[in-house]
Amino acid sequence: NGPNGKSQSIIVGPWGDRVTN
């Protein structure tokens, strides 16, 4: 969950963060 967005879920935030469900 960082500015890199290396997860596989919904993208959140203007930085393109992805949170895992």
From Swiss-Prot:
The keyword Ribonucleoprotein does not apply. Residues 1-10 have a biased composition (Polar residues). GO terms for molecular function: carbohydrate binding. The keyword Transcription does not apply. Residues 1-21 are annotated as: Disordered. Keywords: Lectin. Formed of four alpha chains and four beta chains. D-galactose-specific lectin, binds the T-antigen structure Gal-beta1,3-GalNAc. Belongs to the jacalin lectin family. This is Agglutinin beta-1 chain. It comes from Maclura pomifera.
